[in-house]
A protein has these predicted regions:
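Mature extracellular/passenger domains of Gram-negative fimbrial/pilin and adhesin proteins
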Residues: 2-6, 21-177
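Bacterial N-terminal signal peptides
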Residues: 9-17
Length: 177
């Protein structure tokens, strides 16, 4: 009987010991830091470069008659703004390639779609003219957003718009005043 108690005690101790050995395993990982210190009135929020505009699937017929289609509302988000440095911001947009038929549109730079392009409206709902500053946006201390609307449009009245995928890039520069 005494031997049974000793055997049980040894077995119990062994079981607890193996559990503590199992609990001693660790999980490892790492934290990576990145960013950029800038000498401007505001910094870009991490989700604002690049800003991804996904039009999804837009029927070719939606562009008929010069209609704007897609109309995706997006924001350029600014953070840590300091109004003692500047009180307004203007944005200048420049596509990597301007549509050769309609200079108000960004050209599709890859993909199989053709006959249309991408346009933007600024925070004041004005059509963006590439290379020219937009209407000024009033800044507040802290976080600010600069809204814009991206749209698709046929490149000329009655243009043959070919269905397919497309990509394009428009760069932007923010000037503070």
């Amino acid at each position: 009987m005494k031997m049974n108690k000793v055997a049980m005690a040894v077995a119990f101790t062994a079981a607890l010991s193996s559990m503590s050995v199992l609990a001693a395993d660790t999980t490892t990982g790492k934290i990576e830091f990145q960013g950029e210190l800038v000498n401007t009135a505001c910094g870009l929020a991490p989700n604002s470069s690049p800003v991804i505009v996904d039009f999804g699937q837009v029927p070719v017929s939606a562009l008929a008659g010069g209609n704007h289609a897609g109309n995706v509302h997006k924001n350029i988000e600014l953070q840590h703004c300091d109004t003692t440095v500047a009180t307004t911001a203007v944005v200048t947009y420049n596509p990597t390639s301007v549509n050769p038929t309609d200079a108000t549109l960004a050209a599709f730079t890859s993909g199989t779609a053709s006959g249309a392009g991408i346009g933007l409206r600024d925070s004041a709902s004005q059509d963006v003219v590439w290379g020219q500053a937009t209407t000024a946006v009033q800044l507040v201390n802290g976080t600010n957003t600069i809204p814009f609307v991206a749209y698709l449009k046929e490149e000329s009245a009655g243009a043959t718009v070919t269905a397919g995928s497309f990509q394009s890039t428009v760069n932007f520069e923010i000037a503070y005043q």
